[in-house]
UniProtKB/Swiss-Prot annotation:
Name of the protein in its database record: Androgen receptor
SMART domains: HOLI (SM00430), ZnF_C4 (SM00399)
Site annotation Interaction with coactivator FXXLF motif: residues: E755
Taxonomic source organism: Aquarana catesbeiana
Domain NR LBD: 526-757
Region annotation Disordered: where it falls in the sequence: 53-95, 110-132, 205-241
Site residues by UniProt (Interaction with coactivator LXXL motif): K578
Length: 777
């Protein structure tokens, strides 16, 4: 909606060119103020009583007259008035004199020869186009405008218009009152030319002191007689409801350029004044057109394409109440008259009843349509609007920031699958995985299938290569924490037991199995395959040390390679422990403590198994690229420790340990050393350790056909774990001594190994930890 605002009122017709920018409004205001001053002085005739009360009103085509009658309210003109109302002596004096101009305007008029003269004003009035500014002043204004890159074409259309001057705001509409004037009187408007209908405009004139102060109403609420009513200057003078004289101004967001008046500078002059109850006089530009609903979102006025929800507002737009800030006795008026905002647009023809269509008020409705929003939508938060939106919420602006959102607003980013890094579809088998890994794990875990990796158990498992190696994929599923629940295991065990019984009907008919013998065997048979599949899947992969076998063996080279191998294996040990069934039920601090104290024993136990499987316990198989023979054992200066480790590897062969028994022994070996003072959740630790011992017993019972032979084996296998503890303490002591003279012997220690050796090994050597044995002897 377009409203053409000048310093003297609302213009009837639009100018030839839209004025934009703060500098153009500034020069326009100064120029029109000078024109209005000269025009008011030129149009006065002291000999006529009418000329003392009638003043030209600035319009775009035809100047209208402004009249003032003291003590007379607003009235609609009934045509041409033969006799004007009498004017008071105060109103007969010229309303615009040089004293009403500011000091700057006086200096411009005095220096540039712009003072009005009687002869010039009369000739200018007769020609109908008065002289606006002197030639030198014109040249100055034009030169400044050209230097600032502004156009002077818009100023040429206003050469015949006289305007008021506002003192407290640089760009503003007509003033309501000043400190000296407390009331405004508006008289009827006389038009001699009735050949075509034009919209009439009201006027503001200075008057004397009124009975009531500005902005106040009678306390008892009684109405005054028509002759004694006065229009307060707090807001724009309003006409009666339904009249064409009622109008409003749509205040758009503009530059808040405020020029304080002289009375504001002295705060001590008014000690009782409330400086927080006044509205800020924010003036708009000369002509502003805003159609974006974002500017009005959430405010009391609504958007320009919808009506306000507050009563008393016929359309969106704030009240055009201009105030001289912080004036004594000033109050903010509330408008309840719907005709306040029913002013017409001069360039759009009205309907037959004087009403204007929606297209006249909202020219963009045909393209955008009406916006009906009963409930505020959620604003789209951006980096630049965060602080601004917070301020708007504090001010009560909680509406729509933007009605369009990016596509990722409605579809938040998905979390990746912990197994193949695809988009996870939910929590399956106690882990956040995708649907493909869910189906794969169900088939692999319940089907008791044996998968073998064609590589080194280190295949890359992602969205595109997850089907290449099922063995590594299943291992990664177990590492992610996927596990079959207890109910699932029990159900699966019952089904397999039923199939086993149905498979041999003749045997079951021939002889009955004792109940005390059948239940342990069924439970052991049903539960062990699934549990062993989990342990097999999470088994740490074989890691290479990076040792260069082409170089001659030396103490520093062999020990540095062993330390590097320990660093790499430690990473896999941590991953294996976290994937160990039941290990995450421990307290977080207990998990770290167990790993830091048992990492050396786990590596010794695993190295003994690899030596037994790969080289038949003849050598120490630390890694595929690092195998210790007799020569390297002597060269490393740790021959006694190597002999003990080789003896441990030989015990695997003497006992004929199976891979399933080794997997079940590996869990208890991680839970074989704790601090002397105990753990934070010692009860949970003891339950977890006892469960692994029971699982080892079930594996032994399941693999041995003769139950009588299971007891000696169950005694020997845990004893194998007990033989790891002396080797662990001896090797830790050797490592700590080597760490103290590492720089002297040129042996490299990786960062993680250095931290553990310097912090945890002294606790082990000082007796602050205790090993847990399965047997007393």
């Amino acid at each position: 909606m377009e409203v053409h605002i000048g310093l003297g009122g609302v213009y009837k017709q639009p100018p030839g060119k839209m004025i934009r920018g703060a500098f153009e409004n500034l020069f326009l205001s100064v120029r029109e103020a000078l024109q209005g001053e000269r025009r008011s002085a030129a149009s006065l005739d002291t000999s006529s009583p009418i000329s003392a009360c009638v003043h030209p009103h600035p319009t775009w085509n035809e100047p209208s007259t402004w009249t003032e009658v003291r003590g007379t309210p607003w009235r609609e003109p009934q045509g041409a008035q033969p006799d004007p109302p009498p004017c008071s002596p105060r109103s007969q004096a010229p309303q615009f004199t040089l004293s009403s101009c500011t000091t700057e305007l006086k200096e411009i008029l005095g220096e540039q020869g712009g003072m009005p003269e009687e002869g010039n004003s009369e000739s200018a009035s007769k020609e109908g186009y008065p002289e606006s500014i002197s030639d030198s002043a014109k040249e100055i204004c034009k030169a400044v405008s050209v230097s600032l890159g502004l156009s002077m074409e818009a100023l040429e259309h206003l050469s015949a218009a006289g305007e008021w001057q506002r003192g407290d705001c640089m760009f503003a509409g007509p003033p309501h009152h000043t400190m000296g004037a407390q009331t405004c009187q508006v008289a009827e408007e006389d038009k001699s030319d009735t050949s075509f209908s034009q919209y009439r405009e009201g006027a503001f004139r200075r008057a004397g002191q009124s009975t009531y102060s500005a902005g106040k109403a009678p306390e008892d609420g009684s109405s005054l007689p028509t002759e004694d009513k006065e229009q307060p200057c707090t807001d724009m003078a309003l006409s009666e409801p339904g009249s064409l004289r009622s109008r409003g101004m749509e205040v758009m967001p503009s530059l808040t350029l405020y020029k304080p008046t002289a009375f504001m500078e002295d705060a001590s002059a008014y000690p009782g004044r409330d400086y927080y109850s006044f509205q800020m006089a924010l003036a708009p530009h000369g002509r502003i057109k805003v159609e974006s609903p974002i500017e009005f979102a959430g405010s009391a006025w609504g958007g320009p394409s919808r009506y306000s929800e507050f009563p008393g507002f016929s359309h969106c737009g704030p009240s055009a109440n201009w105030h001289s800030l912080f004036e004594e006795g000033q109050a903010t008026a509330s408008y309840t008259d719907s005709s306040l905002y029913s002013y017409p647009r001069s360039h759009v023809p009205a309907g037959p009843d004087g009403e204007f269509s929606a297209e006249a008020w909202y020219p963009a409705t045909a393209m955008l349509g009406r916006v009906h929003m009963a409930v505020p939508m959620r604003p789209r938060m951006t980096h630049g609007w965060t602080a601004t939106l917070g301020i708007r919420r504090r001010l009560g602006w909680t509406g729509v920031e933007s009605t369009f959102y990016p596509i990722d607003y409605y579809f938040p980013p998905q979390k990746p699958c912990l197994s193949c890094e695809d988009e996870a579809s939910g929590c399956h088998y106690e882990a956040l995985t995708c649907g493909s890994c869910k189906v794969f794990f169900k088939r692999a875990a319940e089907g008791n299938q044996k998968y073998l990796c064609a590589s080194r158990n280190d295949c890359t498992i992602d969205k595109f290569r997850r089907k290449n190696c099922p063995s590594c994929r299943l291992r990664k599923c177990y590492e992610a924490g996927m596990t079959l629940g207890a109910r699932k295991l029990k159900k699966l065990g019952n089904l397999k037991a039923q199939e086993e019984l149905e498979g041999s009907p003749g045997q079951s008919e021939g002889r009955e199995m004792p109940p005390n013998m059948s239940i342990p065997q069924l439970e052991g048979y049903s539960c062990q395959p699934i549990f062993l599949n989990v342990l097999e899947a999470i088994e740490p992969m074989v890691v290479c040390s990076g040792h260069d076998n082409n170089q001659p063996d030396s103490f520093a080279l062999l020990l540095s390679s062993l330390n590097e191998l320990g660093e790499r294996q430690l990473v896999h040990v941590v991953k294996w422990a976290k994937a160990l069934p039941g290990f995450r039920n421990l307290h977080v601090n207990d998990q770290m403590t167990v790993i830091q104290y048992s990492w050396m024993g786990l590596m010794i136990f695993a190295m003994g198994w690899r030596s037994f499987k790969n080289v038949n316990s003849r050598m120490l198989y630390f890694a595929p690229d690092l195998v210790f023979n007799e020569y390297r054992m002597h060269k490393s200066r740790m021959y006694s420790q190597c002999v003990r480790m080789r003896h441990l590897s030989q015990e695997f062969g003497w006992l004929q340990v199976t891979p399933e028994e080794f997997l079940c022994d590996e869990g208890p070996s991680a839970l074989s050393i704790i601090p002397v003072e105990g753990l934070k959740d010692q009860k949970c630790f003891d339950e977890l350790r006892m469960n692994y011992i029971k699982e080892l017993d079930r594996v032994i019972s399941c693999k041995r056909n003769n139950p009588a032979s299971s007891s000696p084996r169950f005694f020997n296998l845990p004893k194998l774990l007990g033989s790891v503890q002396p080797i662990d303490v001896n090797l830790v002591q050797f490592t700590f001594g080597l760490f103290g003279k590492a720089q002297m012997v040129s042996v490299d220690f990786p960062e993680m190994m250095s931290e553990i050796i310097s912090v945890q090994v002294p606790k082990i050597l000082s007796g602050r930890v205790k090993p847990l044995y399965f047997h007393s002897s």
